[in-house]
Each structure stands twice: as C-alpha cells, then as structure tokens.
Amino acid sequence: MIAPVFVDTNILLYARDAGEPIKQPLAEQWLRRLWQERSGRISAQVLSEYYVNVTRKLVPGLSAERAWEDVEALYSWVPQATDCALLTRARELERRYPLSWWDSLIVAAAQLQQCALLLTEDLQDGAQYGELSVRSPFTLAVSDVGAPYRVEREQAAPRHRERGRPIGSRPKRS
C-alpha cells in the first residue's frame, strides 16, 4: 500500500480534460490507483478550485450537477479543512520556503494529513518539504512508486470494544 498521496487540483482537472490527450490518461491512471488503495488525500481548497474550474473554465466543462457528484465522491479522500492549524502551518511554510500563499496552503494540507507524496504540476518536481516529496504525475509513473512511498497496511481497529468496564478501568485490589 502506498502512503497517503495528496492530489492537487490540476491533476483532477487533467483527468476530466479531453483536450489533453497525453496528460488525461496519466492523471486517470494515478487517480484509479489512489481510489483502489484508498490513499488519495485532498483539501477543501482543492475541492473548491476543482468545482469552479471544471464548471467554468474547462472546455467542454461539466455541468454543476456532475461536478458536484465528483466533489461528493472526493469527500471520502478526507479533505483537509481550512482551519487555524492549516493557516498557521501554511504561514510557517511561506516564511521558510519560496512558496506563494496558495502553494503554502497545499503543502501544509498535505503535511497535516501525513502524506508522503504531493502530486502537482505547480511546484518543482522533486522538491522536498520535510517528509513530503513533490512529484509531477507526468514524470513519475504509477508503477515507479516504490519503497519511499510505501507503508504497511495498518491493522483495522476493532469495530466495538468488548462489553463491560470502560477501556483502561480496572477494579482496585486491596
């Protein structure tokens, strides 16, 4: 299983853009893999940008209804909310690295979700921000995602605890 992978807006848009015959199938291949492994991650910012661009700028664009279906499906990718933690982390990144505010928000969202990889075309391919690697999905083949981006599948927590005393409570012995 690959570690969580943050997907920037442009990758989602390329997957819908029939006017990009080279990039569209590559973006689709990445998204298919991330859906299969349940390792895709995004942010509220990405969802907003996707909705606006796929309905207003992409030619031919999607209807608002179809675009919203995509957004709702992507809720399962655990969108990072725009909250105080995200803004604070983005500001730290903006001060430390030569990043725009919007790129700082993307990197911060990926870091807060503990992603190993950020797929984007907007940042330098191969850039490193702490433990986060930036790669272009058009230079890194899905099949080349090896050891640096792999994690052991976490064991699922039990759905319910056994009935009885709350976890961690024990009767005191005298």
Where are these regions (language model features)?
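Active-site-proximal, substrate-binding regions of enzyme catalytic domains
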Residues: 28, 45, 51-78, 85
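Acidic active-site catalytic centers that drive phospho-/nucleotidyl reactions
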Residues: 8-10, 49, 103, 122
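Alpha-helix C-capping/helix-to-loop hinge sites
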Residues: 15, 33-37, 53-57, 74-78, ...
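Active-site neighborhoods of divalent-metal-dependent phosphate/nucleic-acid chemistry enzymes
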Residues: 79-121, 158-160, 168
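Acidic, metal-binding active-site segment of PIN/NYN-like and related structure-specific nucleases
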Residues: 104-146
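Short beta-strand segments at enzyme active-site cores
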Residues: 42-44, 119-120
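General small-molecule cofactor/ligand-binding pocket signal
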Residues: 41, 80-81, 135
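Short, well-structured N-terminal submotif of metal-dependent ribonuclease cores
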Residues: 1-42, 57-65, 144-147, 152-174
